[in-house]
């Protein structure tokens, strides 16, 4: 639960893994891939970790890159992150920015599962997909991971 300063400093190295999460894999490509994709799209990316408490990964994509490279189908990717089984929380914040200011709201994985039931259900997946593909705003994701 949480990472040491050394682990955190090597987190974006695709050839580094602590060996705890996936003992059979010699490399961890998820975070390095995410960081590069966010950077290429002009978004923001950050990681906060406290040993004994947990790790939070924050990233935001500009609306102009929701369905273009480097991701292509960001809505589908976020849906996969949302329904992936395990002990973690995902918070997706939708923000609408106009000349007059901005408004935002959040959807949390835990609240969604409670409200919609099994997110593998077809109706639940369609509701999530609609949320992730709405063209009204940009998408910011915070994923709190318990290790």
Each model region followed by its residue ranges:
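Short conserved segment of the HATPase_c
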Residues: 3-15
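Glycine-rich ATP-lid/hinge loop adjacent to the conserved G-boxes
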Residues: 16-26
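Gly/Ala-rich beta-loop-alpha elbow adjacent to hydrolase catalytic centers
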Residues: 30
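Conserved glycine-/histidine-rich ATP-lid loop and adjacent helix of the Bergerat-fold HATPase_c
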Residues: 33-43
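A short beta-strand-to-loop motif within the catalytic HATPase_c
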Residues: 47-51
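Glycine-rich GHKL/ HATPase_c ATP-binding element in histidine kinases
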Residues: 53-55
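HATPase_c (GHKL) ATP-binding subdomain of two-component histidine kinases
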Residues: 58-59
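N-terminal assembly/transducer modules of large multi-domain enzymes
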Residues: 63-147
């Amino acid at each position: 639960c949480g990472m040491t300063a050394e682990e955190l400093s090597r987190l974006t190295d695709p050839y580094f893994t602590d060996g705890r999460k996936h003992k059979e894999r010699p490399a961890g490509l998820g975070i390095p891939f995410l960081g590069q994709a966010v950077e290429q799209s002009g978004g923001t990316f950050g990681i906060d970790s406290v040993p004994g408490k947990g790790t939070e990964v924050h990233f935001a994509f500009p609306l102009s890159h929701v369905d273009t490279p480097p991701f292509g189908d960001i809505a589908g990717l976020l849906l996969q992150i949302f329904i992936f089984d395990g002990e973690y929380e995902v918070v997706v914040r939708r923000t609408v920015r106009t000349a007059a200011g901005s408004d935002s709201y959040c959807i949390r994985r835990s609240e969604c599962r409670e409200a919609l039931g099994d997110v593998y259900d077809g109706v639940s997946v369609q509701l999530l997909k609609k949320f992730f593909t709405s063209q009204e705003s940009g998408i910011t994701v915070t994923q709190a991971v318990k290790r």
